[in-house]
């Protein structure tokens, strides 16, 4: 299904704050790791944010193009196991999760590619897993959304 977005920016994730943002689905398709976001916090410095403050977007998409896993572990839920284990994942195509919340995200760039480290937590009531840590390399990122709604929650604390 083709989606159309009003705002589309490439390689601008350093201007998107993802802590506590909810992701309804993470999956691999068309050589992209796709994050279907319920919302994102678009920082004031983002080239497509016309406001002097960070704003929360509505639903949007983050795509990591030509991704390659450097490290990925999936933590089993402590509710389903007395001795929870970490499960390594090695292929991007194995990444298919629903209802995750970003706890940590950082991006770096070198001469060859971008890299990101992220930790996402799952709702233990709906998942066999507690969360996942992903360290991934990719050629570029694309961030898409339609509207900037309210001022971001953290603007009151700056």
Residues of each region from the PLM?
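Surface-exposed, interaction-prone regions used to assemble/regulate multi-protein complexes
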Residues: 1-158
